[in-house]
Protein backbone atom coordinates (compact mmCIF):
# COMPACT_ATOMS: atom_id res chain seq x y z
CA UNK A 1 0.00 0.00 0.00
CA UNK A 2 1.40 3.39 -0.98
CA UNK A 3 1.89 6.35 1.38
CA UNK A 4 -0.78 9.01 1.73
CA UNK A 5 0.03 12.09 -0.35
CA UNK A 6 -1.15 15.68 -0.26
CA UNK A 7 -2.89 15.06 -3.58
CA UNK A 8 -4.89 12.29 -1.87
CA UNK A 9 -6.17 14.80 0.68
CA UNK A 10 -7.04 17.26 -2.08
CA UNK A 11 -8.98 14.52 -3.85
CA UNK A 12 -10.65 13.26 -0.66
CA UNK A 13 -11.91 16.75 0.24
CA UNK A 14 -12.52 17.71 -3.43
CA UNK A 15 -10.79 20.97 -2.56
CA UNK A 16 -10.45 21.98 -6.20
CA UNK A 17 -14.20 21.61 -6.64
CA UNK A 18 -15.18 24.14 -4.01
CA UNK A 19 -12.17 25.77 -2.35
CA UNK A 20 -11.47 28.52 -4.86
CA UNK A 21 -8.38 30.35 -3.65
CA UNK A 22 -9.56 30.35 -0.04
CA UNK A 23 -9.19 26.68 0.88
CA UNK A 24 -6.30 24.38 0.06
CA UNK A 25 -4.32 21.43 1.33
CA UNK A 26 -1.12 22.47 3.08
CA UNK A 27 2.17 20.59 3.14
CA UNK A 28 0.98 18.55 6.15
CA UNK A 29 -2.04 17.31 4.18
CA UNK A 30 -4.47 19.39 6.26
CA UNK A 31 -7.19 21.69 5.03
CA UNK A 32 -6.01 25.29 5.32
CA UNK A 33 -7.91 28.51 4.81
CA UNK A 34 -6.55 31.81 3.53
CA UNK A 35 -9.39 34.27 4.15
CA UNK A 36 -7.70 37.21 2.44
CA UNK A 37 -5.23 36.95 -0.44
CA UNK A 38 -1.68 37.64 0.67
CA UNK A 39 -2.44 36.95 4.33
CA UNK A 40 -1.45 33.98 6.45
CA UNK A 41 -3.21 30.64 6.15
CA UNK A 42 -4.89 28.89 9.05
CA UNK A 43 -4.45 25.12 9.38
CA UNK A 44 -7.94 23.95 10.37
CA UNK A 45 -6.68 20.75 11.99
CA UNK A 46 -4.21 22.70 14.11
CA UNK A 47 -6.98 25.12 15.01
CA UNK A 48 -9.20 22.25 16.16
CA UNK A 49 -6.31 20.68 18.10
CA UNK A 50 -5.71 24.00 19.86
CA UNK A 51 -9.40 24.32 20.70
CA UNK A 52 -9.38 20.82 22.22
CA UNK A 53 -6.40 21.79 24.40
CA UNK A 54 -8.51 24.71 25.63
CA UNK A 55 -11.44 22.33 26.39
CA UNK A 56 -13.60 23.67 23.58
CA UNK A 57 -15.60 20.73 22.27
CA UNK A 58 -16.82 20.23 18.74
CA UNK A 59 -18.82 20.97 16.78
CA UNK A 60 -17.35 24.42 16.39
CA UNK A 61 -18.57 27.07 14.00
CA UNK A 62 -15.71 29.00 12.42
CA UNK A 63 -16.58 32.07 10.38
CA UNK A 64 -14.39 33.86 7.87
CA UNK A 65 -15.77 37.38 7.41
CA UNK A 66 -12.84 38.27 5.15
CA UNK A 67 -14.10 35.72 2.62
CA UNK A 68 -17.55 37.34 2.65
CA UNK A 69 -15.97 40.77 2.22
CA UNK A 70 -13.78 39.56 -0.62
CA UNK A 71 -16.72 37.98 -2.46
CA UNK A 72 -18.68 41.24 -2.24
CA UNK A 73 -15.69 43.14 -3.61
CA UNK A 74 -15.28 40.58 -6.42
CA UNK A 75 -18.96 40.76 -7.45
CA UNK A 76 -18.81 44.55 -7.47
CA UNK A 77 -15.56 44.64 -9.45
CA UNK A 78 -16.84 42.14 -12.04
CA UNK A 79 -20.04 44.12 -12.58
CA UNK A 80 -18.07 47.37 -12.76
CA UNK A 81 -15.79 45.90 -15.44
CA UNK A 82 -18.75 44.54 -17.44
CA UNK A 83 -20.60 47.87 -17.15
CA UNK A 84 -17.55 49.71 -18.42
CA UNK A 85 -17.04 47.24 -21.26
CA UNK A 86 -20.67 47.47 -22.42
CA UNK A 87 -21.30 51.15 -21.66
CA UNK A 88 -23.82 50.47 -18.89
CA UNK A 89 -24.19 53.69 -16.92
CA UNK A 90 -27.21 53.12 -14.68
CA UNK A 91 -26.78 52.65 -10.95
CA UNK A 92 -26.57 49.03 -9.85
CA UNK A 93 -27.10 47.21 -6.59
CA UNK A 94 -25.83 43.94 -5.20
CA UNK A 95 -28.71 42.09 -3.57
CA UNK A 96 -28.09 39.39 -0.96
CA UNK A 97 -30.94 36.85 -0.62
CA UNK A 98 -31.21 36.38 3.13
CA UNK A 99 -32.37 32.76 2.66
CA UNK A 100 -28.77 31.88 1.73
CA UNK A 101 -27.66 32.39 5.33
CA UNK A 102 -29.90 34.08 7.88
CA UNK A 103 -27.45 34.03 10.79
CA UNK A 104 -27.28 37.54 12.20
CA UNK A 105 -23.45 37.82 12.35
CA UNK A 106 -23.22 36.77 8.69
CA UNK A 107 -25.94 39.16 7.54
CA UNK A 108 -24.48 42.01 9.61
CA UNK A 109 -21.03 41.44 8.09
CA UNK A 110 -22.50 41.43 4.60
CA UNK A 111 -24.50 44.60 5.27
CA UNK A 112 -21.59 46.36 6.97
CA UNK A 113 -19.04 45.64 4.28
CA UNK A 114 -21.56 45.88 1.46
CA UNK A 115 -22.69 49.40 2.32
CA UNK A 116 -20.08 50.99 0.06
CA UNK A 117 -21.13 48.65 -2.78
CA UNK A 118 -24.88 49.50 -2.73
CA UNK A 119 -25.71 46.14 -1.18
CA UNK A 120 -29.34 45.44 -0.37
CA UNK A 121 -31.24 42.46 0.96
CA UNK A 122 -33.88 40.22 -0.57
CA UNK A 123 -36.68 38.62 1.43
CA UNK A 124 -38.81 35.85 -0.05
CA UNK A 125 -41.17 35.33 2.88
CA UNK A 126 -42.72 37.25 5.75
CA UNK A 127 -40.29 35.81 8.36
CA UNK A 128 -37.37 36.75 6.10
CA UNK A 129 -38.82 40.24 5.69
CA UNK A 130 -39.03 40.60 9.49
CA UNK A 131 -35.35 39.62 9.73
CA UNK A 132 -34.32 41.98 6.94
CA UNK A 133 -36.18 44.92 8.49
CA UNK A 134 -34.53 44.20 11.85
CA UNK A 135 -30.94 44.12 10.57
CA UNK A 136 -31.15 46.62 7.71
CA UNK A 137 -30.69 49.94 9.51
CA UNK A 138 -29.39 51.91 6.53
CA UNK A 139 -32.26 53.88 4.99
CA UNK A 140 -30.41 54.03 1.63
CA UNK A 141 -30.18 50.24 1.33
CA UNK A 142 -32.70 48.40 -0.82
CA UNK A 143 -35.04 45.69 0.39
CA UNK A 144 -36.40 43.51 -2.40
CA UNK A 145 -39.56 41.52 -1.63
CA UNK A 146 -39.80 38.35 -3.70
CA UNK A 147 -41.99 35.32 -3.47
CA UNK A 148 -45.66 34.92 -2.67
CA UNK A 149 -47.13 38.10 -1.26
CA UNK A 150 -50.21 37.65 0.87
CA UNK A 151 -51.96 40.56 2.55
CA UNK A 152 -49.91 40.44 5.77
CA UNK A 153 -46.63 40.30 3.81
CA UNK A 154 -47.65 43.37 1.80
CA UNK A 155 -48.78 45.18 4.97
CA UNK A 156 -45.42 44.50 6.60
CA UNK A 157 -43.58 45.77 3.53
CA UNK A 158 -45.68 48.95 3.47
CA UNK A 159 -45.12 49.46 7.20
CA UNK A 160 -41.36 49.14 6.63
CA UNK A 161 -41.67 51.71 3.86
CA UNK A 162 -43.40 54.09 6.30
CA UNK A 163 -40.43 53.51 8.64
CA UNK A 164 -38.17 54.91 5.92
CA UNK A 165 -36.99 51.65 4.34
CA UNK A 166 -36.53 51.47 0.54
CA UNK A 167 -38.88 48.60 -0.26
CA UNK A 168 -39.56 47.10 -3.68
CA UNK A 169 -42.54 44.75 -3.85
What are these language model-derived features?
Residues 8-11, 17, 80, 84-86, ...:
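Residue-level detector of functional hotspots within protein domains
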Residues 87-169:
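Active-site-proximal beta-alpha core segment in soluble small-molecule metabolic enzymes
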Residues 12-15, 21-24, 49-52, 134-136, ...:
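A general structural signal for short secondary-structure junctions and capping/turn motifs
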Residues 25-39, 44-102:
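Low-complexity, highly charged intrinsically disordered N-terminal segments
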Residues 1-4, 10-12, 40, 73-75, ...:
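A short linear-motif detector with a strong N-terminal bias
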Residues 9, 24, 41, 58, ...:
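Generic serine detector
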Residues 12-14, 70, 143:
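Short acidic/polar alpha-helix capping motifs at helix-coil junctions
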Residues 1-40:
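N-terminal basic/disordered segments at the start of proteins
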Amino acid sequence: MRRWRIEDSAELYNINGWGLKYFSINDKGHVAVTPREGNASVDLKELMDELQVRDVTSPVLVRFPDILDNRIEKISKCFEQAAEEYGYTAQNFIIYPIKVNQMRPVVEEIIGHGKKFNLGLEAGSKPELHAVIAVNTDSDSLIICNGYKDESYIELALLAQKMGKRIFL
